Amino acid sequence: GFTNPATLSARTYTLIAFHEFENAQKPGGVESSFVMQRCLHCLEPACVSACPTTAWSRQSDGPVRYDEDECIGCRYCQLACPWDVPTAEWDSLAPKISKCTHCNDRVGQPVPTAFNGQAMNDNETKRFTGSIETPACVKACPADALRYGTRDEMLALAHKRIADRPDKYIDHVYGEKELGGTTVLYLS
């Protein structure tokens, strides 16, 4: 296919997969779509439930986090995840599990007042704040299709988009109820 890399891996946390399917109403009889595959940061995460240690936890603000120092390498999390998201570093002598971190190393961090020893002006502070307030995938999305906020904010936005454009979207927010709900939601 056209997707590169083909699957999630210890170094690929988010995958945009290209899919083609038959549609007799489209020119050439084929339609295509792009589907994002990544950790959905479940409300009731199977990886957390399956872990015999405290390597996995769900944070109150939504993200499912992994602590490699607590991991014993059993990989039960891989077996439990319905989306096959946690992946092992198979090329390592002591493989750890890897997945989307929800950019926990940057989201919500305090904004510095200086950069490279120079005090930042208001415009620089605003630009810097904008870059650390959202996960990298949201910041980098060239189609501006991704949004970031609380689950309630995102559900409200999703339902508004469906109501505003019923011709464009299927009347369903994926992740609202599936497997107990997720903090990452999809429209199609």
Which residue ranges define each predicted feature?
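Non-ligating segments of multi-cofactor redox enzymes
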Residues: 1-188
